[in-house]
Amino acid sequence: MRSQWVAKRRGQSNVSQMHYARQGMITEEMDYVAKRENLPPDLIRQEVARGRMIIPANINHLNLEPMAIGIASKCKVNANIGASPNSSNLEEEVAKLNLAVKYGADTVMDLSTGGGDLDTIRTAIINASPVPIGTVPIYQAVESVHGNIEKLTPDDFLHIIEKHAQQGVDYMTIHAGLLIEYLPLVRSRLTGIVSRGGGIIAKWMLHHHKQNPLYTHFDEIIEIFKKYDVSFSLGDSLRPGCTHDASDEAQLSELKTLGQLTRRAWEHDVQVMVEGPGHVPMDQIEFNVKKQMEECSEAPFYVLGPLVTDIAPGYDHITSAIGAAMAGWYGTAMLCYVTPKEHLGLPDAEDVRNGLIAYKIAAHAADIARQRPGARDRDDELSKARYNFDWNRQFELSLDPDRAREYHDETLPADIYKTAEFCSMCGPKFCPMQTKVDADALTELEKFLAEQKNKEAIAH
C-alpha cells in the first residue's frame, strides 16, 4: 500500500512523519490515520508536529496500515511475541503475529532473544504484519556476542540498531535513560532492576565503569532513525518490578533523563514515545501518568500494565488490566498487554488471546471514560441487540465473538436458541429483559401519577 507513498521520499536525509508535519505537510500516512481515527487530517499533523502523537511507519515496512499513538487518538494496545532459546520456530512466530492481529493488537513487539536466526524471524514478521512492529535491539546485540555482555562495544549496539531499521522495524526500545549514577539508587529496592534491557546495560556499566553507551551515542541513533523514520520507544530500565518499588527515586531520576532525551530527539524531528511502569498501586497511577507528561513534554506514554498488586501469579492479565484501564483514563496513549503467564512462563496462543482481550477491554473502557467521540457507539449497539435478544448480533459486536458464542452454546447450542428471549442464566420465565414497557403504557402511567399528585395537593 505504501510503495508509492515512500518512493518519493527515498534519499532524503530525514523521512520522519514529524519532519513532514513540521513543514506543514499532511502525508498519506497522516491522512490514512485521520480516517481511521475519525479526526481532521490537520489535527493529526499538528499533534505529530507537537510530539504528542506518533505514527510509527518505517519507510521499509511497505505493507503497514498506518496507525497513531497519542492522547488525541484512541487508546492502543501492544502485544509481545518472540522466539526464545527454549522455544523458536519461524512459523510459530508468524502464527502468533496473526493471532495477535486477529484479537485486536494495534502494534506487535518482536522480543526474540535467541534460539534461531533472529534476522530471518524478524523479517518474516515484518513482511507479514499490517501493524507496526517494535523491537528491543539490545537483545540481538547480546546474542551476537553469545551472552558475553561485557564484550559489547558501542559500535555493536549501533550496528544492530541500523540493521533493524533497514529491515523495516517501526519503533525500537532504546534503554538510553539509565545513567551510571542511577545504579546505586536501586539498593533499597525489593526487586532491583527488572527490565531485561536495563539489566544488560547495568551489567555492562558495572563491568566497564563507563557511562551507558546508548546515552553517549544517542545522537548517532537519532541519525539512523531519521533515515528510516523509526520511532523511539524510550525504555524505562528502572521501572518498578513490584508495588513496593513504585515511584521511587530510581524510577523518577531515569524519567527526568527520558524527558531530556525526548526533547533532544525532537530537535532532529524524530518521533518519540516513552515507556512506563510496571507495578504501581492504584493510588499512584494518576501521579505516574501526570509526572511523565510533565517530565517528557507530553510525549505519548506507553505502559506495561501496570499491575496493581503482586499476589496473583496466573491472573496478572487481570491485576494489570485494572491498572491499564486507569492509566488509559488518565492519559496513557498505549498499553502493553500482560498475559496470565506473566512471571511464570512463555505464553501460548490461549494466553495471548486472554491477555489481548483483557487489554482491549481496558483500552476501550479508558476511551469511554475520556469521552472520546463515538467510543460508546459499539456498547450501545450491543445493548440494543441484547435487549432485543438478537444473539448473533451480540456475538458479532463482542470483543471476542468466538468466546461469547462458545459460552452461550455450552448450554443452549441449537440454532433455535439464537432467537430465544432468554439464556440459561434465567431461563424462559425470569429474564428481566422480557419486560418490555411500551410508550403508551408509560404515558398512561404518567397521567395517573399526575392525577394522584393533584389529588394529594388538593387534600393538603
UniProtKB/Swiss-Prot annotation:
Its cofactor is [4Fe-4S] cluster. It is an enzyme of class 4 (lyase). Its EC number is 4.1.99.17. Keywords: 4Fe-4S, Iron, Iron-sulfur, Lyase, Metal-binding, S-adenosyl-L-methionine, Thiamine biosynthesis, Zinc. Zn(2+) binds at H279, H343. It catalyses: 5-amino-1-(5-phospho-beta-D-ribosyl)imidazole + S-adenosyl-L-methionine = 4-amino-2-methyl-5-(phosphooxymethyl)pyrimidine + CO + 5'-deoxyadenosine + formate + L-methionine + 3 H(+). It holds the Pfam family ThiC_Rad_SAM. GO terms for biological process: thiamine biosynthetic process; thiamine diphosphate biosynthetic process. InterPro entries: ThiC, ThiC/Bza_core_dom, ThiC/BzaA/B. Substrate binds at N80, M109, Y139, H175, S195, R196, G197, D236, S237, L238, R239, E275, Y302. One of its GO terms (cellular component) is cytosol. Pathway: Cofactor biosynthesis; thiamine diphosphate biosynthesis. Binds 1 [4Fe-4S] cluster per subunit. The cluster is coordinated with 3 cysteines and an exchangeable S-adenosyl-L-methionine. [4Fe-4S] cluster binds at C423, C426, C431. GO terms for molecular function: 4 iron, 4 sulfur cluster binding; carbon-carbon lyase activity; zinc ion binding. Catalyzes the synthesis of the hydroxymethylpyrimidine phosphate (HMP-P) moiety of thiamine from aminoimidazole ribotide (AIR) in a radical S-adenosyl-L-methionine (SAM)-dependent reaction. Belongs to the ThiC family. This is Phosphomethylpyrimidine synthase. It comes from Rippkaea orientalis (strain PCC 8801 / RF-1) (Cyanothece sp. (strain PCC 8801)).
